[in-house]
UniProtKB/Swiss-Prot annotation:
May be involved in MAP kinase activation, epithelial sodium channel (ENaC) down-regulation and cell cycling. Keywords: Cell cycle. One of its GO terms (biological process) is positive regulation of MAPK cascade. The keyword S-adenosyl-L-methionine does not apply. This is Arginine vasopressin-induced protein 1. It comes from the Eukaryota. InterPro entries: AVPI1, Avpi1/C8orf4_dom. Residues 121-134 have a biased composition (Basic residues). It comes from Homo sapiens. The keyword Cell cycle applies. Residues 1-24, 104-147 are annotated as: Disordered. Residues 105-119, 137-147 have a biased composition (Polar residues).
Length: 147
């Protein structure tokens, strides 16, 4: 095998432009000099539910090359954006108005309907969680390395 093109085409350091010589060298581990609280804040801002745990893992294993690989695979999670007008309209579309005559005629049936809807919603949610339980995603890499 020959020499990679990137190695061949790079000029020696003494021939590099002045502004390139003054730049800081790139680091393979971007969290090398970071404090634990800085890493936690980074994960919290990205919307991670397990920010403290992930930050602790990264901080303890800062020199491990597997952590760097896991971080490359970790996708940044962004919380959903809220539009000023769309946000209020979105919530209004979920409202359900009960008919006054049905609520007055039989108040117990309205309560039963609401509780049955909550039960169906919780069943759908738990089924979705069970279905996705064993799927490996980008956030599971850090736990696989640690445990």
């Amino acid at each position: 095998m020959g020499t990679p093109a990137s190695v061949v085409s790079e000029p020696p350091p003494w021939q590099a432009p002045i502004e390139a010589r003054g730049r800081k060298q790139a680091s393979a581990n971007i969290f090398q000099d970071a404090e634990l609280l800085q890493i936690q804040a980074l994960f919290q801002r990205s919307g991670d539910q397990l920010a403290e745990e992930r930050a602790q893992i990264i901080w303890e294993c800062a020199g491990d090359h597997r952590v760097a690989e896991a971080l490359k695979r970790l996708r940044r999670k962004r919380p959903p954006r809220q539009k000023p007008l769309g946000h209020s309209l979105h919530h209004c579309s979920r409202l359900r108005i009960l008919e006054p005559h049905s609520a007055l005629a039989n108040p117990q049936s309205a309560t039963e309907t609401a509780s049955s809807e909550q039960y169906l919603h919780s069943r759908k949610k738990s089924a979705r969680i069970r279905r996705n339980w064993r799927k490996s995603g980008p956030t599971s890499y850090l736990h696989q390395i640690r445990h």
